[in-house]
Regions:
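Long, low-complexity, compositionally biased intrinsically disordered regions
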Residues: 1-257
Length: 257
C-alpha cells in the first residue's frame, strides 16, 4: 500500500506559491491524477509512482519521451513535472461507491439499455475484484470547473490510451456532451455510461441538460486538450533540449540514441 501525504504545513508568514494539485486515486497501485499543464484548463493526466517496486510512469507521450531520453543519457532517475508533484499529493479518499439501485433507476427512465446496464455491472465487479474504484470523480476543490466534469474510470485493460487500466472521461454540463479518450470514437463506450451512473447517483443536477453519451462532435474537452497539449509540447521540446545539453556537459562520452 502506498500513500503520499503532505508532511509539513507552511510556516506562518511565509508566502507559498500555488502549486498544481495532485490527488491519489488508487493507493494500492500508486496511481495519481494531476493537471496536464501548470496553467490554464486543468485537464487531468494519470501518473504512477510506487517507491517500493520502483515503478514510475506518466501517461503523457511527451513525458515518456522526456524520461526515455534521461535513461538513455545515463540519468534514469529523472521525472517529469507530473511525477514530481506526487510528493505533495492529497491523500486517497474513497469516492461514493456506485449502487446498482441507482443504475436500475437509469434503466427505468430510459437513460440506458439493459445491455449497457450489464456491461456497467460487469466492469464494476471487475474493479471491485481488483481492489480499485470503478469511477473516481476528479474535483480540484475551489479550482473545479463548473462546466467540465472529469472522471478517472477503470477499464480493466492496458493499452496506449489506458496504460494504468484507467481512462479519462469528461462531461460538458452546459452542452450535455461526453468525451472519453478510449478507442470507441464512433459510438458510446461503457466508460461514459459508468461516469453518467456516478453523476446520476451523486450529482443529478448536473444532468439537467439533456445528455447523450454518443454526442461528442463538438465536445469542449477536445478543444481544451488541443490547446493545452500544444502549449505543453512547446515546453517539453525546450525541456528536452536543455536536458540533452546538460547531460552532454556532465557525460561527454554518452551518446543519445
Amino acid at each position: 500500500m502506498f500513500i503520499y501525504c503532505p508532511s509539513e504545513k507552511p510556516k506562518a508568514g511565509r508566502q507559498v506559491k500555488e502549486q498544481p494539485p495532485v490527488i491519489c486515486i488508487d493507493e494500492r497501485n500508486g496511481i495519481f491524477v494531476t493537471p496536464k499543464d501548470s496553467h490554464g484548463p486543468r485537464v487531468p493526466v494519470h501518473v504512477k509512482k510506487q517507491v517500493v517496486s520502483g515503478s514510475i510512469a506518466c501517461e503523457s507521450p511527451l513525458c515518456r519521451d522526456f524520461m526515455r531520453i534521461g535513461v538513455e543519457s545515463g540519468n534514469p532517475g529523472i521525472e517529469c513535472d507530473h511525477l514530481q508533484r506526487t510528493n505533495r499529493a492529497v491523500c486517497y479518499s474513497a469516492p461514493a461507491a456506485l449502487r446498482e439501485d441507482s443504475l436500475q433507476s437509469m434503466v427505468d427512465r430510459g437513460l440506458l439499455s439493459k445491455t449497457r446496464q450489464d456491461e456497467c455491472v460487469q466492469l464494476r465487479k471487475k474493479s471491485i475484484a481488483g481492489g480499485v474504484d470503478c469511477v473516481f470523480p476528479i474535483f480540484w476543490h475551489e479550482h473545479t470547473s463548473v462546466r467540465l466534469v472529469y472522471f478517472s474510470v477503470f477499464t480493466g485493460v492496458k493499452d496506449n490510451w489506458c496504460q494504468f487500466e484507467r481512462t479519462r472521461v469528461s462531461f460538458d454540463s452546459h452542452l450535455g456532451k461526453w468525451h472519453c479518450q478510449c478507442r470507441n470514437r464512433m459510438r458510446s463506450c461503457v466508460h461514459r455510461y459508468l461516469s453518467m451512473w456516478w453523476l446520476f447517483q451523486e450529482k443529478p443536477h448536473l444532468l439537467s441538460c439533456q445528455t447523450n453519451p454518443n454526442a461528442e462532435d463538438s465536445d469542449l474537452d477536445e478543444r481544451v486538450i488541443d490547446v493545452a497539449e500544444t502549449e505543453v509540447a512547446t515546453l517539453a521540446s525546450t525541456d528536452i533540449q536543455e536536458l540533452t545539453g546538460f547531460v552532454n556537459k556532465r557525460t561527454p562520452n554518452s551518446r543519445l540514441l
